[in-house]
Each structure stands twice: as C-alpha cells, then as structure tokens.
Amino acid sequence: MSYEKELAAAKKAVTLAARLSQEVQKTLLQSQVWKKSDRSPVTAADYGSQAVVSLVLERELQPDKLSLVAEEETGDLRKNGSEAFLEDIAKLVKDTLASEESYTSSPLSTDDVLNAIDCGKSEGGCKGSHWVLDPIDGTRGFVRGEQYAVGLALLVEGKVVLGVMACPNLPLASAVCATDNSSQEDVGCLFFATTGSGTYVQSLKGNSLPQKVQVSSNENLDEAKFLESYHKPIPIHGTIAKKLGIKALPVRIDSQAKYAALSRGDAEIYLRFTLNGYRECIWDHAPGSIITTEAGGVVCDATGKSLDFSKGKYLAHKTGIIVTTKKLKPWILKAVRESIEEENLYF
C-alpha cells in the first residue's frame, strides 16, 4: 500500500511544528529560562507543536476521527489561572499556521487549540490506524540550543509504516564533523521513511531535493562509533563498549536525532538501557525505528526481537533497546548479553 498522501501531510505537519519550536527556542535562549515547568517556554513548545501537528493532519487528511498517541494533554491548560499561558500558546499556533500560505485565512480559537492537543489522548493498539507523536523530544538539548527532534509515525494494525523526523539543529552533512563554524544554511534536517521505500533526508528549509540515506557499511568494531546523550549513561554502556573494543569517543546527541544520525552513517551503535521499572513510550521510538530500519539498520531488544508497538502507549519489552547495523548486530547482541549476565542486571 502506498502512503503518499499520509507522508505529504506528515512532512508538512512536522515541518510546521519544527518552525514553531525554533521560534520558542530563540526566546528560550534569549531569556535564559530553562526549567520545564507548567508554564515554561519548553512546555509551550510541547503544547504548540502537538496542536500544530494535530491541526495539520486533520486539515490535510480529513479523517472521520483522528487517532493520535501523544505526550501532552490539556488538564493544566483548562485550570483557572492558565488563561494567559493558553493565549500565548494559541498565538504561537496561529502564527505558525499563518506562515503556511494555504492556512493564512483559517480562524483558530483557544478551544480549537485545546481540542487539537487533546486529539493526542488515543491509546493506540493493534487495530486500525494511529498517529504517534513526540512534539519535542530531547528537552535537555532543546534548552541548550542544541539537538532535539519532532517525531511523527503512523501505525497501521500495530506496525510502523511511516516516520517523519525534524532535527532543526542537526547539520545536513554529518553530526560527527559539525563545528561551531558550520554554516546555518547547512543546518536543519527532515528525515522521512515509508515501509519498503527507504529513508530520505532533505533540508528542513525545503531548499533541497530529498537524498536517500544508508546506514554505515563499516564492519570493523575498532572504527565503530557509539551515539549517546549528554547526560550520564548507565554503567552497562561502558561495559558493552569495552567488550566490543570500541576506541572512538561517543558522538553525543540528545533526543531521537540519534536514530536519524545512525540512519545516514554518522555512527554505528546506539544503546538505550534504562533503570528497572522505567517504561518506554512508543512515541520515543516509533519515528526513529522506521527511519533506521528503512535505511538498512536494525532496531531490537537485547534478545534480538524487533520492538512491538502494538500494545498501547508503552513498548512491551524489558531488555533495553539496540540500534545498529545488520553487520554488527551479532557482535553487539553477544556483548550485551554477556554484560547483563556478568553484572546480574534486570531490566
């Protein structure tokens, strides 16, 4: 089945949501406000991004009922005392949509914005079609003016069939070679993939044609690179790297942008192991998983099984997430299993 119409709508939705987030990030950096609280700029970006994506999908696809699995809900926005904050969010959404020529004359009330955000209350599941959204992934990177992502995926009968990810601060060339002197014209990526059609990247500004990407062809673990967030990883990551003989320093990127970077060969390994009891949300991995697998990569748990997105808002797995290339997968699985056994860890 072709998903051309859905892909076009998703690309437009994510591009506009990224535009909103970039405006908020500018304000954030100027004001030096960084804490994510109920009425912080970070939260405004989350709400605004979710509203924009919901409204664009509704307008472009006109479904009988939009099913969106997403992070935000409007309970706090509907409380007394939140009126001014809600007005600020509504203005962000209106201004963003007005920047798209086809939406300039569309009226929008605060109730419209609230209802759009609350479209994200879907539970997902194994039946029907569900959009899955992370409106702002990578809060730490976002507040520092560094890497974050807006990720959107489409689930059909429990399978991810489409993914779009905007990485507004990711260089078009390579995350590894980026410098402080990188031209702003070369920054901002839009990755997208549909099942069976490969993964592509183009400028988020829309001024370049899509280019097909592939994961790294490197088979030498001595030359392989890890992708890690800036916050301190749990110790097993270091144990696994040592077993594999990894010599290169990790490529540090916050958010799902790590999936995107791996899909185009910036690095070969991304591991995500969390503390016991933590449940992974599907919006943190659905967009990135198809972007990586359609580029020739592998996304699985520590037993080698593919991730299951059909169980609702949370992934049904307990053993971490491994993102790598098909060539390196056997070695990484072996190192992961040995490390888990040696450290007597339970996930």
UniProtKB/Swiss-Prot annotation:
Its EC number is 3.1.3.7, 3.1.3.57. One of its GO terms (molecular function) is metal ion binding. The active site is at D46 (proton acceptor), T139 (proton acceptor). Mg(2+) 1 binds at E71, D134, I136. GO terms for biological process: sulfur compound metabolic process. Substrate preference is 3'-phosphoadenosine 5'-phosphate (3'-PAP) > adenosine 3'-phosphate 5'-phosphosulfate (PAPS) >> inositol 1,4-bisphosphate. No activity observed against 2'-PAP, 3' or 5'-AMP, inositol 1-phosphate and fructose-1,6-bisphosphate. The keyword GTP-binding does not apply. It comes from the Eukaryota. Mg(2+) 3 binds at E71. The gene is SAL2. Adenosine 3',5'-bisphosphate binds at T139, S255, K258, R272, D284. Mg(2+) 2 binds at D134, D137, D284. This is 3',5'-bisphosphate nucleotidase 2. Signal peptide: none annotated. It is an enzyme of class 3 (hydrolase).
